[in-house]
Amino acid sequence: MSKTTQLSFPAADPFILRAVDGRYYLYCTSEDGSGIPIHVSDDLVHWQRCGTAIGKDTARWGVGCFWAPECYEINDKYYLFYSADWKENPTGALENFRIGVAVADDPAGPFADMADKPIFDPGYPIIDADVYTEDGRYYLYYSRCCYEHNVDGLEESWIYGVELKPDFTGVIGEPVLLLRPEQEWEGRSAAATGRRWNEGSYLLKHNRKYYMTYSGNFFAGPDYAVGYATADTPLGPYTKAPENPILERSAQVTGTGHNCMFRTTAGELMICYHGRTEATGNDRIAFISPAHFDEQGRLVIDAE
């Protein structure tokens, strides 16, 4: 694909898996948060709905806000990591999100929760799971929500990483803070919302460097945008790119963010993210654009 493709249906927080059958599966947040839709395509242009991965009718621990799924093929099984509102809420927290994992034999499901509780409880609400594996070890990246996380008078969302147990039943060690809002562009929503965000991380490796893409600003606002940071190890420390943001609003599309990256069957590097247009209104629509690394090792999005 040499140009940006806009999908024809709402697909917030999109994640695309290229499965062993050669087909592409898209998992996303539904606009009402009641479940995680699955779509399938042979060419990244024409898509068909093929099911719901998990939702309030099938989940064992979540009761709503089924958000930000990512699906991975591991040892002939499909593992879906996602965020949801945890039913265990003794304090009545307004944001009680945690991360869980469901498993299936097929990328189209049916998926079933592996446990009746989240993977772990850090003691604060978390969303936006991303999982990276290397040398037999698994790493979970997530976003601590802004909720009740006051930093110098503003609530902030931070990105953490932690090693996962190989059977996904918990974590190993303590989470490590990786990214927090620091660059000027990450505060464009602060005056209107009282919050600053770093969220929606995705990790990939290129030439022995780890590249973490992430989103900044309010997801429902026009200034939602994507930056990246690099590190020499999966758990950092990470240094943000000075050229951030690398994907932001244009005259046609606003609110561009919460991306994943993948390679096509031809080996092309692609980024999938959501955004809004005048025609789509408040619905978040998925876009797929080519991407590449330049001679200096900078990540470049070709979103024309």
Residue ranges and their predicted role:
Residues M1-E304:
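Carbohydrate-active catalytic/glycan-binding domains of CAZyme proteins
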